[in-house]
Amino acid sequence: MMMKFINIGYGNMVSAARIITIVSPDSAPIKRIIQDAREKGKLVDATHGRRTRAVIITDSDHVILSSVQPETVANRLYGSDDFSEEG
């Protein structure tokens, strides 16, 4: 079985099969989703202290913050800029 991982910046990877959506963090509803995830302990901050540019929501209700643009993450998801692991 082949698992596809997407690089979300600074050596961090997310399973492509678990991603539901990739959005910009600028709108008020997304900011509320981030705050709710923080309170529930389901927030993963992969920005390494940099500005959040993309918010990735997974099927397990985890919210992942990335400093990579949403368009870049989407291109990696649907393009050839990905990593695979057999397992």
Swiss-Prot record:
PANTHER family: REGULATORY PROTEIN SSL2874-RELATED, REGULATORY PROTEIN TM_1690-RELATED. It comes from the Bacteria. Belongs to the RemA family. This is Putative regulatory protein GTNG_1019. Pfam families: RemA-like.
